[in-house]
Amino acid sequence: LLQNSIKKLKSKKIKISVINTPGIFEIPITIKMNIKKFDAFVALGCVIKGDTPHFNLICSSTFDAIMQLSIKFDKPIGNGIITALNMRQAVERSGKIGSVKPNKGAEAAHAVLSILENDPKKI
């Protein structure tokens, strides 16, 4: 995810910084703490469903918080967080070698680039 996201952003000469979090639940607060330092964010991660409702709660609250931050602070945030039912799905969606699915990291970076290119404040 990260390598393909970086590759996509660098292809457009975007200056990047990588900030790691312990898990996806910590992504929104990390973005909020850094919201004034960057023009945009690409959130990357992976959650694989287990046997409890924890998966649904974590994913739902994280995705909602990311969207709320994007709207509140008028900042594009590409969501490259993979939600998968099993490891096979996670690997397919991550763009690993042999995967036939598109890479979610590159897709999230592309989404951010599209928003930045159409930013009316830059016109």
Segments (PLM) and residue ranges:
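Phosphate-binding/catalytic loops
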Residues: 85-102
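Short, ordered loop/turn segments at secondary-structure junctions
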Residues: 21-24, 46-47, 82-86
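A charged, well-structured terminal subsegment
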Residues: 99-123
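Glycine-rich phosphate-binding loop
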Residues: 29-66
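Glycine-rich phosphate/diphosphate-binding loop of Rossmann-like nucleotide-binding domains
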Residues: 1-18, 22
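Short, acidic/small-residue loops that bind anionic groups at enzyme active sites
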Residues: 56-84, 102-104
